[in-house]
């Protein structure tokens, strides 16, 4: 249980391998194809940023399976000199993005999306969701970074 709150592996094995392990668990428990790739020169990422990105990956993938009935999810992380770009793309059912609630409804629907947006906003970063019925979903996160050379 403690591991799920804050994975110790960030410090031990790094962010990328931690993501791979999380996606392995998802693959094994849901019979889904999950791919993870990185581009750019990898650098250390602040632990708050790492944890937030991991939570966004977990929530977006969970939504892809539960609501989108996706069979394949592609996660990519692009290390750029001044930002990190995370993209999560699925082949699920897709949906009308105008139907995303701005705030959580009484039945807690939309809670995961609201939490993802709030977590990214606090870093500060930007989160966008693009989707159309029948065309899957793309969640994109851009976070500015101040890496030390």
Where are the model-predicted features located?
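Coiled-coil dimerization/phosphotransfer module
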Residues: 1-149
């Amino acid at each position: 249980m403690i591991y799920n709150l804050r994975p110790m592996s960030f410090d031990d094995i790094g962010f990328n391998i931690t993501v791979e392990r999380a996606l392995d668990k998802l693959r094994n428990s849901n019979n889904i194809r999950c791919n993870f790739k990185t581009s750019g020169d990898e650098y250390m990422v602040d632990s708050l940023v790492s944890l937030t990105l991991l939570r966004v990956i977990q929530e977006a993938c969970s939504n892809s399976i539960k609501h989108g009935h996706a069979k394949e999810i592609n996660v990519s992380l692009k290390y750029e000199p001044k930002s990190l770009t995370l993209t999560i793309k699925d082949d699920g059912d897709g949906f009308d993005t105008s139907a995303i609630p701005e705030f959580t409804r009484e039945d807690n629907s939309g809670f995961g999306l609201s939490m993802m947006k709030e977590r990214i906003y606090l870093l500060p970063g930007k989160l966008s969701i693009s989707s159309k019925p029948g065309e899957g979903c793309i969640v994109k996160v851009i976070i500015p970074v101040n890496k030390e050379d």
